[in-house]
A protein has these predicted regions:
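Catalytic cores of RNA-modifying enzymes
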Residues: 1-214
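C-terminal lobe and adjacent flexible extensions of AdoMet/dcAdoMet transferase-like proteins
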Residues: 196, 214-225
Length: 225
């Protein structure tokens, strides 16, 4: 059944306050799933599964999924759609306040079409606080993706670029047309992969990141004055 079927069945209305734009193109969901490249022993945490387009493709590959969805109506839809599937846990909770310490056991992979309104804040939180997530396959606003992979002396380079260069190997994978969503977003989307590196000097790197934030803040103040 198509994503439009599920949207219409429960009369789902995207909420702008949650930055909701539902992925309806199963070809894109499949391309994202192929980038996961995990072992079946690697459990997946999916943030913002929405109507379950990406969730459905991940389940076809027999991944074990913990899906975190803040919207109660969408949580109901997901439970109706996947309630009989044994290897998925659907959690109605805000990804920003979710207790990630429960991600125990083997390394985790995070997959998701991140809501535009929390994408940057959530990624910074996860990279700095949740080392057990070792790989990310995510879609987010193209400008944020460009900032993550930006190199020094380029337009998008900033403190977030420093953070991800210190702790990860991040790569842009492909852009996603606005036509792949319902409703169509006004901003462009990009899929990227982030591999968190295992580091022995994380404390030093955190200090370097904090110094970079101060430096960029001072730079912005000078530009304003």
């Amino acid at each position: 059944m198509s994503e439009i079927f599920w949207i219409n069945k429960l009369n789902i209305k995207p909420r702008k306050t949650l930055g909701q734009n539902f992925l309806i193109d199963t070809n894109i969901s499949r391309k994202i799933t192929k980038l996961v490249q995990g072992q079946l022993a690697d459990p997946i945490i999916e943030i913002g599964p929405g109507t379950g387009s990406l969730t459905n493709e991940l389940l076809k590959d027999n991944y074990r999924i913990k899906a975190v969805e803040v919207d109660k109506q969408l949580t109901h839809l997901l439970r109706e759609r996947f309630g009989d599937v044994p290897n998925i846990e659907i959690i109605n909770e805000d990804a920003m306040s979710f207790d990630y310490s429960q991600l125990t056991g083997p390394w985790w992979i995070m997959v998701g079409n991140l809501p535009y309104n929390i994408g940057t804040r959530l990624l910074i939180k996860l990279i700095t606080e949740v080392p057990q997530i070792h790989r990310y396959v995510i879609m987010l606003q193209d400008e944020v993706a460009e900032r993550i992979v930006a190199k020094p002396n380029t337009k998008h380079y900033g403190s977030i670029s420093v953070l991800f260069s210190l702790f990860t190997d991040s790569k842009l994978q492909f852009n996603v047309s606005n036509n792949c969503f319902e409703p169509k977003p006004k901003i462009l989307s990009t899929v990227l992969t982030i591999q968190r590196e295992t580091l022995v000097d994380e404390e030093i790197r955190f200090k370097a990141f904090e110094i970079s934030k101060i430096a960029f803040q001072q730079k912005r103040k000078k530009i304003k004055t």
